[in-house]
Every structure is written in C-alpha cells, then in structure tokens.
C-alpha cells in the first residue's frame, strides 16, 4: 500500500539530474528509454542497445492542477495494455488501487472486473474508471486522480455491482479520491472492447426488456428455467390435450346445432355456451402450433421474453392470444355458475307450471359476457400480460404472481363457492322429491331423477377436483417463485463471472440453476384446465345424442327414418284439430308429423322431467289413427268450435242472435224454467238457413243455453237420432234418419212437432241418454270426455 512506501521528495531532484547527465555522456538510447518508463520491462532492445523503440511525439499535457494530483512512487508499466486498449504513457502506480500492492495483483483484479463485459452498458462506462484507478498515469512522482464525473457515470449502468457486492471504498465517489473538474489522460483512450451478454441474457437496446440491474441485456425468449427437451415435451402435451378438448367441445356444439329447435331450452342450452367458451379457449392454446406463431406470440422483436404487455412497440399477437384464452376461460366459469343456478331453480319448480327462468335469460347473458370483459380490460390497463415459452401463450401474472392471484384464482374461488352451493342445493331438491313424493313420480321420471343426481354428483366432484388442482399448482408457484428467481440470478452472475471483492485464484465452478420449477406440476395444472372443458362436453354423451345424429344423417342423405317417433299428446291433438275441415271431408286421412313435431329430450338427456303425466309421449304409428279417435269423441263438428272458450264462460245477454243455439234440457230443469217463462216473452227458434216456422203447439219450448256458441256452418249431412224429433208413428223405434242439419231438423212429411196441428208429445230420453241435451250440445261433449277419460285410444 502507499502508506508503507516512504517517499523522500527533496532527494529525487539530484538523483534525476544525475541520471540525465549520465544519459548525455553515455548516449545510451536503451537506458534513456527505460528511464523514461515507455517499455514494459527488460527485453532484447534494452540488452543489446542496437535498436531503439520510437516513442510517439505528443503535445505536452496541460499543467496538472494541485487538487487533481497526488504524490506517488512511479513505476514503469509492466503491462502497457489496460482492458484491451493501449495506454499512452509508460509509468504508473498502485497508490489508488486499495486492493493491490503490485502491478501483477492489479492486473489480476482487472481480469476479475472484466466479468462486467457481460453487462454492455456498464462495461462501456466502467472501463475508463478501472484503468484510471488500477493503472493511472504517473509522472514526476505525481499520479493523476480521476474526476468525480468519471466515477458517477458508472453508478446507474453498473447498479448490479452495488446490489450484489457493493463498491469498494477506493471506488466510491468520495471527494478525496475523485475531485471535481479534473482532466484525466484515460478519458482520451478509445476502448474498443464492446460488451456482450452472456446466455441466458441477450443484447437489447429496449429498456423495458433489460434484466434487473443489467442494463443492455434481457432474458432470452426461451424460458431458461426449463431445458429444450422439457420445452418440446410440454408442447406435445399441450397439442394432445388441446386437440382433445377442442374436438369434444366442437362435437357438443355440433350436436346442439343439429337439433337446435329442441335443444334451445334452458337450462340445457347453457351447456352450449359453456362448451363454446372452452372451444374458443382451446383454439387460443392451439394457435401457437402455426408456422412461426409461438415465437411471434411470446417473443419480442429483439429476442427477449415478452412481459408487461401491451406495449406500443410490439405486435398485438400476444394480446390477442391472451384475450382469447382469458376471456373464454372467465366466461366459461361464469356460465358454470349460471348453469348451477338454473338447475337449482328448475328442480324447485318440478311438478308445477311455473317457469322460473322465464324472463331471466337476458340477465344471464349480460352477466356472463360483461364480467369477463371488465376483468380483461382491467388487466390490459395495468399492462400485466406476460409471455411464456413453455406454455406457448400469453397470460396474466407470469411475472407478477399477485396479479395472477387477483385475476385468476379469486374469480375461480368465488365460482367454486357460489356454483358449489347451487349444485348441492339442486341435488338435495331432487333427492327430496324422490324421497318425499314417490307416488307423484312415474317410473320414467324416477329413473331420470336417479340418473341426473348421479351425473350431477360426478360432475360436481370433477369440478371441485379440478379447481383444487388449479389452486394447489398456483400456490406451488407462488411459494417457490422467489427461490427460483434467486437461483436464476445466481446463475446469471456465475455466467457473467461477476465476483467483485473476492480476490481468489480458484477456478470458477460450473454454473447451473440449482432450483427449478417442476414440469410435472405444470402438466397437472394444464390437465385441470383442459379436463374441465372435456367434463363439460360429457353432458351430451347420451343415447339421445345418437338419435339426433341418426335423424340428422337421414335428413342430409334423404333417407327415411323408419323408427317410430314419440309425439306429445298435446301436439298430436292440436295437429288433428287444426286440420278438422280436411279430416271432415276425408275421415280416413292420416296426419303427417314433421321432425320438429317429434318430442324428445334433446342432447342433454335427464334434465327434463314430467312429473304430472305418466306417459307424455305416444307412438307415431298410433298417432296416424288419431282422426278416428277425434271423430269418435265428437271433436270434429260441422260447426266451427276453434274458439270455444276454455274457461268458465260468462252468460251473454239474453237475445236471439247467431251466437246462441237452442239445446234440449232435462224435464227437471224444464219445470224450473217453466215458471220463469211466465214472466218473459216466448222466444222463437232461430234457424240460420231458413226462417223458423211459426209455432202453434203448446209443447214446452226448449230453454236457451247459457253457453256461448259459434255461428253455424252451412248445412251438412250428419247422423242424428230420429226419436229425438218424432214419435214412433213417423219412424221405427231406434231408426236413424239422414237430416241436413241437426240443429234445424227437417220435419217428417207425416208429422212435425213444430208445424201447426201437431199434437204428438215430445219424447224425452231417460237413463244415460235421458236428461241430456242434443247429441252435439256442449254438455253432452263434456260428459262424453269424462266418461271416456280412461279409455285406451
């Protein structure tokens, strides 16, 4: 150290004067050169004295300021090159280097400092400082002190030194070591050794890509925590599971579309939207396998890893993939909550006519599409989208796990709680219906309830399992991420050979990353995500789906499907009633039913229960004979009854018009009505086809029915009982007479009870046919329906 070297300043001048005198007398150029300090040491030129080394002639240096120099013992340079650049002077001193006592030791320290070559921006500014301290210019027993500006220029780019080891005391920018405004010869040296980045860092001029405290270098695009073989293994894994998920969800979507008219019913149609979300998400995962797409997605133009997206200087490929994957994932999990809620409310309404989801579907869509949109916009606003070469996509929180916890785990955890609550309540509702009301359930409905409870249980178990796996894998990442970053930083420093302050000559050990994430955990995490999509698609793995595709194939190829169809009774009767006019002309005509009339559960079997009707379906083969059944029951009449009221009618005003039809009543009712006829005028029978003949007999007049009737159709032939209008004298007992209109019968030419002079009494039927009105009255039809309600058609 300089403190151990006594310097006798006054004795130096006579000694130097004596040396100059000897030089002039002897004329030895070699010795003069040696004394001038411009050679590196003994050599052939100085030994023989026959040759001379030319010294470049330079302009005299400016006078050294008093505060810019310090007295020192000058030594001839043993190494005239500092960090690859030639020095323009021949003498130096080790006074300023506090960790070196000789030029050899100073040279060894410079070799260690040369590890900063792997930090390009730091290396560009620290080279002059190191040469000015370890190999300063020394002349006339005074050493030049480097300026404070030269020292401070290294603080920013070389922050890694301060962070890792700290600056030595003699390199701290203190005024006694680095005075202000001092020129230095080293500042004029052009250092031609450019810095480079050691793998896994790459050179970049983008400040956003710089690795922390290593300006000019960024992390390479390929994740250094995983090997190349692990990258290939993970990519094959993603390709396989992504393809399976995409195909399963695509099959589900196609099944719904093939039978959309029957499948577009809540809550089953919610599974269509859930599978659509997972299908779009799988497309985002598989996009990396297009030619050159993965590098475009996860890498920046300078070859560094993407993080902190979106940025204005890069393409939108990373952001697009993030939006596709994240938005689809969040929309899918929100739809899952809506699905469990719809199941819960639908099961509660079983056995009633109440439609709990009516009017709520718009709110379902508003919630499921807007909430993921808000989360996506929030992530893009805070610029926390990062790329990952292992997964091949861009996602939130690869760099900062706190954002991944807030934008991924928090929504999924909330979905698990809410969806699990509704799912458990739905299963409990089904179990309660089955246990407490066994008599209300048909065998088919009970079987559907058992099947649905089993499927809901399996589905709930898978959902809880996949969410638990996702949380476990993320917590594994969160708890170990700091250790992985530390291990990677040590690896970077080892590769850069930054060993500041460790004066050792031991060989540098092999650099390796000691702690790395497990590839198996990453695979399990991806399996949970892809497995959720596959589980959502299993709801259409039913026999009903096979029937749908069979009908679709027959429809596309033009072949007929000979399998008997199941048709709802209500649809069948409505079909026959709508064609009553055609069937009246041709009673043997068969009804044709389109595929849209056919009743089936849709692709999601087991979610539609009919607890009130034990046999809601009938065979399509039997349905072809529905015309005979309708005719036998009197549903097809010569009059238009298409608007017959279904509720209790309100009695109209008592006036004769086309909407009131006379009907025969029982004798008991006739007696009661006879008293009222004294207080009101007798009414004449109205016949729409011809004027009613004037009545002159004293027979009891049928009372006006209070049931509203439709206008009569034109006169048509039909069968009526002859004894309802005449006596046995005019026709045989039990014989039938063909009349034009049962409501306006044609009188017999021998005797007509409505013509003047007719004295035959009316014959009223007794028993089941007695006391009833005409054969086509509303009362007669209703009783016939009640009596034949249990008959087999």
Curated annotation (Swiss-Prot):
InterPro entries for the chain: Frizzled/SFRP, Frizzled/Smoothened_7TM, Frizzled_dom, Frizzled_dom_sf, GPCR_2-like_7TM, SMO_7TM, SMO_CRD
Effect noted on mutating residue 170 to A: Reduced sterol binding
Residue sites binding cholesterol per the record: 99, 398
TM annotation in the entry: 238-258, 266-286, 319-339, 363-383, 407-427, 456-476, 529-549
Effect ascribed to mutating residue 113 to Y: Loss of sterol binding and reduced response to SHH
Phenotype for residue 118 to A: No effect on sterol binding
Top-rank taxon: Eukaryota
Region annotated Disordered, chain positions: 35-61, 674-703
Pfam families cross-referenced by the UniProt entry: Frizzled, Fz
GO molecular function: cAMP-dependent protein kinase inhibitor activity; G protein-coupled receptor activity; oxysterol binding; patched binding; protein kinase A catalytic subunit binding; protein sequestering activity
Region (Required for interaction with PRKACA): 574-657
Modification Phosphoserine, positions: 560, 578, 594, 599, 642, 666
Effect of residue 420 to F: Reduced activity in response to SHH
Result of altering residue 112 to A/D: Reduced sterol binding
Cellular localization per UniProt: Cell membrane; Cell projection, Cilium
Expression by tissue: During early somite stages of embryonic development, modestly up-regulated in the cells of the node (at protein level).
UniProt-listed GO biological process terms: anterior/posterior pattern specification; apoptotic process; astrocyte activation; atrial septum morphogenesis; cell development; cell fate specification; cell population proliferation; cellular response to cholesterol
Free-text domain note: The N-terminal extracellular domain mediates sterol-binding which is required for maximal activation of signaling. Contains a second sterol-binding site within the seven-transmembrane pocket which is also required for activation. The activating sterol is likely to be cholesterol. The extracellular site is required for SHH-induced activity while the site within the transmembrane pocket regulates basal signaling in the absence of SHH.
Protein name in the entry: Protein smoothened
Source organism of the structure: Mus musculus (Mouse)
């Amino acid at each position: 150290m300089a403190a151990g070297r006594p310097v006798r300043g006054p004795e130096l001048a006579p000694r130097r004067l004596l040396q100059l005198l000897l030089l002039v007398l002897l004329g030895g150029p070699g010795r003069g050169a040696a004394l001038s300090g411009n050679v590196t040491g003994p050599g052939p030129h100085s030994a023989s004295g026959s040759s001379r080394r030319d010294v470049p002639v330079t302009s005299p240096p400016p006078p050294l300021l008093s505060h810019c120099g310090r007295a020192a013992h000058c030594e001839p340079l043993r190494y005239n090159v500092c960090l690859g650049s030639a020095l323009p002077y021949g003498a130096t001193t080790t006074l300023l280097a506090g960790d070196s006592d000789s030029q050899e030791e100073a040279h060894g320290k410079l070799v260690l400092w040369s590890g900063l070559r792997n930090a390009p921006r730091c290396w560009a500014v620290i080279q002059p400082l190191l040469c000015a301290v370890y190999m300063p210019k020394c002349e006339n027993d005074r050493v030049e002190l480097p300026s404070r500006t030269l020292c401070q220029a290294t603080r920013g780019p070389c922050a890694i030194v301060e962070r890792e080891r700290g600056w030595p005391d003699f390199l701290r920018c203190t005024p006694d070591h680095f005075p202000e405004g001092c020129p230095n010869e080293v500042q004029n040296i052009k250092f031609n050794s450019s810095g480079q980045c050691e793998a896994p860092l790459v050179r970049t001029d983008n400040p956003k890509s710089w690795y922390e405290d290593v300006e000019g270098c960024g992390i390479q695009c390929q994740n250094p925590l995983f090997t190349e073989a692990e990258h290939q293994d993970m990519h094959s894994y993603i390709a396989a599971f992504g393809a399976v998920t995409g195909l399963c969800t695509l099959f589900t979507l196609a099944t719904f579309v093939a039978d959309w008219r029957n499948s577009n019913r809540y809550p089953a149609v919610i599974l269509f939207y859930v599978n659509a979300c997972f299908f779009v998400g799988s497309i985002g995962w598989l996009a990396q396998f297009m030619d050159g797409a993965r590098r475009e997605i996860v890498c920046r133009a300078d070859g560094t890893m993407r993080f902190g997206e979106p940025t204005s200087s890069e393409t939108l490929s990373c952001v697009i993939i993030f939006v596709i994957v994240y938005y689809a994932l969040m929309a899918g999990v929100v739809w899952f909550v809506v699905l469990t809620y719809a199941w819960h409310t639908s099961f509660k309404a079983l056995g009633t006519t109440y439609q709990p989801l009516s009017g709520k579907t718009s709110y379902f869509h508003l919630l499921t599409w807007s909430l993921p949109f808000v989360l996506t916009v929030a992530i893009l606003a805070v610029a926390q989208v990062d790329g990952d070469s292992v997964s091949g996509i861009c996602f939130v929180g690869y760099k900062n796990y706190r954002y991944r916890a807030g934008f991924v785990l928090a929504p999924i955890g909330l979905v698990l709680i809410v969806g699990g609550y509704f799912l458990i309540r739905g299963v409990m509702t089904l179990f309660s219906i089955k246990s407490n009301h066994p008599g209300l359930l048909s065998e088919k409905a009970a079987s559907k309830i058992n099947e649905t409870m089993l499927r809901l249980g399996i589905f709930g178990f898978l959902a809880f399992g996949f969410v638990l796996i996702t949380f476990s894998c993320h917590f594994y990442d969160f708890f170990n991420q700091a250790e992985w970053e530390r291990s990677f930083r040590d690896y970077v420093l080892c590769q850069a050979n930054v060993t500041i302050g460790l004066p050792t000559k031991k060989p540098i050990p092999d650099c390796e990353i000691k702690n790395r994430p497990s590839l198996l955990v990453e695979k399990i995490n991806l399996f949970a995500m892809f497995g959720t999509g596959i589980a959502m698609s299993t709801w259409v793995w039913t026999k009903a789906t096979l029937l749908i595709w069979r009908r679709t194939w027959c429809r596309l190829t033009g072949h007929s499907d000979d399998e008997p169809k199941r048709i709802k009774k209500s649809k069948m009767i409505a079909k026959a009633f709508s064609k009553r006019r055609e069937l009246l002309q041709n009673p043997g005509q068969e009804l044709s039913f389109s595929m849209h009339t056919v009743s089936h559960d849709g692709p999601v079997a087991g979610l539609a229960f009919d607890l009130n009707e034990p046999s809601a379906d009938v065979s399509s083969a039997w349905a072809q004979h529905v015309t005979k059944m309708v005719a036998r029951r009197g549903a097809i009449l010569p009059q238009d009854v298409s608007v017959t009221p279904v509720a209790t009618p309100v009695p109209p005003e008592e006036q004769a018009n086309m909407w009131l039809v006379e009907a025969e009543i029982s004798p008991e009712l006739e007696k009661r009505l006879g008293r009222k006829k004294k207080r009101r005028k007798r009414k004449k029978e109205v016949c729409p086809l011809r004027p009613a003949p004037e009545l002159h007999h004293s027979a009891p007049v049928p009372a006006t029915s209070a049931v509203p009737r439709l206008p009569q159709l034109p006169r048509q032939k039909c069968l009526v009982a002859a004894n309802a209008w005449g006596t046995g004298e005019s026709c045989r007992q039990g014989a039938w007479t063909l009349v034009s209109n049962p409501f306006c019968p044609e009188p017999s030419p021998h005797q007509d009870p409505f013509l003047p002079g007719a004295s035959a009494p009316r014959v009223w039927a007794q028993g089941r046919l007695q006391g009833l009105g005409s054969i086509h009255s509303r009362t007669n039809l209703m009783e016939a329906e009640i009596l034949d309600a249990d008959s087999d058609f």
